[in-house]
Amino acid sequence: MKRNPNFTSLTQNYLFSDLRNRIAQFHSENPQHQVINLSIGDTTQPLDTSVAEAFSQAIARFSSPSTYCGYGPDFGLPSLRQKLSEKLYHGCVNAEEIFISDGAKVDLFRLLSFFGPNQIVAVQDPSYPAYIDIARLTGAKEIVSLPCLQENDFLPVFPENTHIDILCLCSPNNPTGTALNKNQLRAIVRYAIEHNILILFDAAYSAFISAPSLPKSIFEIPDARFCAIEINSFSKSLGFAGIRLGWTVIPKELTYEDGQPIIRDWKRFLSTTFNGASIPAQEAATAGLSTLSKLEAVHYYKENSHLLKTSLLKAGFQVFGGEHAPYLWVKPTIETVPYRDLFDFFLQEYHIAITPGIGFGLCGSGFVRFSSLGKREDVLVACERLQMTPALQ
């Protein structure tokens, strides 16, 4: 058996695995210090009671011969697909265009596998590292970096005379924490249509958007139905990080260059490769969508963002994002950070683990990402430490 040559293009360790190893090493060498880990975007708040009860009831039905069921529908429970159409998309996406899955990351892999190798894939720089790794694993012909710089409000800049097949676009963005407004997103959709680009729109953090002027879905731009696929997840909105449930939207109007509908092939693809997501998880998500606006977890994380942003600004750092996403994009100055390695600076001096911006791409150099998804008590300790000079730690 020959090794898949696509693995040769990957780094030895995935970014967050490497950070875990470095934190563990610091723990072993400095057991007297408590490290506050604000590096990885993992959730900490429990399920809402209504969601947990729906989950328990669904599981209980599997224990009785009279209510047991086997496989569910390949594309998801009709009740959940309909609820998503009504509650999140307000009718601009039909239930038949929504496909329930076991998470956004695996859907990204499925989609890039579905469209096949030798695609030219464009990604924002900085961006979630899984986009590039998955593109490489699925045999992308080329990966085009779209610089998202501070002086351009972190908007992607498209290179001239460069062909792109697929654009991975995330808003609210990981890692910058910034969100596209409707005019900005409309311009990208227009560019994609003019240049025959398919947009894979990652809306995993849309639940954090609170401003009516900011789109939660790319399909708030009507023309996006001709050029975009959207992926989303219940990991942050309902606390399903360890439960695994997401969805993909493929509009009926989206076609190949020969006019054939993509949704038809996607159904065939899923029927072969996927037997449907967990039924208890889907029933729990259906219950959660009924009370989505009342769920406390997102509000909790947004308050964490506010606390961190306030402390970081007082400590002299430049801070971006955090208002409509659970991430803060932080730029230390030479005066505040004498270290070359920003991860080591925060770990050694403040005993806080963050994600170095360079891990998200070359344009992330000089920045770090703070996650607000931690526990409040940890965030408060981090805020207190940030108010102290490093020498006093």
Curated annotation (Swiss-Prot):
E.C. number(s) listed in UniProt: 2.6.1.83
Domain of life: Bacteria
Pathway participation: Amino-acid biosynthesis; L-lysine biosynthesis via DAP pathway; LL-2,6-diaminopimelate from (S)-tetrahydrodipicolinate (aminotransferase route): step 1/1
Cofactor needs: pyridoxal 5'-phosphate
Coiled coil (UniProt feature): none
Reactions listed under catalytic activity: (2S,6S)-2,6-diaminopimelate + 2-oxoglutarate = (S)-2,3,4,5-tetrahydrodipicolinate + L-glutamate + H2O + H(+)
Class in the EC hierarchy, top level: transferase
UniProt record similarity statement: Belongs to the class-I pyridoxal-phosphate-dependent aminotransferase family. LL-diaminopimelate aminotransferase subfamily.
Oligomeric form and interacting partners: Homodimer.
The name this protein goes by in its record: LL-diaminopimelate aminotransferase
Organism (species): Chlamydia muridarum (strain MoPn / Nigg)
